[in-house]
Amino acid sequence: QGDWSSDVCSSDLSASLHHAGQEDFAPTDIGYRELSGSKRDYQTGHWSPNFDSVGFAADINTVFPIDRLNELAESGRIGRVSETHLSYAGNQFDLAGVRLDSGPAGAKLLRERGVDIVLLTPV
């Protein structure tokens, strides 16, 4: 129940999204891809047989709630939505690399870009 009306919000998601032209995710890729909140050419690189992409195809907000974040900003609940969001491949065999390397690196990047709040969006 805090006051987030002046805070900048970003989303971190695990749906292996990336933009056209960015490197796709490989099975052991612990890195992240920077997503633009305004560029809507998202592609999913999720290779798990357990991932159903129907929801993603029907509504991007099922895996990346960018429209919901924009609505929160428009209503004054948050200050604004960051232009930078991060996407990881959540279907990892070993999460140690994300926990110890790319996760902290992504957090550092977002802090440097002025992000105050990160919405974690696992799929």
List the predicted regions and their residue ranges:
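Adenosine ribonucleotide-centric catalytic and binding domains
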Residues: 12-66
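Redox- and metal-dependent alpha/beta enzyme cores, enriched for Fe-S-associated oxidoreductases
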Residues: 65-81, 94
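Charged, often glycine-rich, active-site loop that binds/positions anionic groups
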Residues: 83-105
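Short, well-structured alpha-helical segments in soluble
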Residues: 101-116
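Single conserved hydrophobic/aromatic residue that forms the stacking wall/gate
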Residues: 1-8
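Gly-rich Lys/Arg/Thr-decorated short loops/hinges at beta-loop-alpha junctions or inter-strand turns
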Residues: 46-52, 81-90
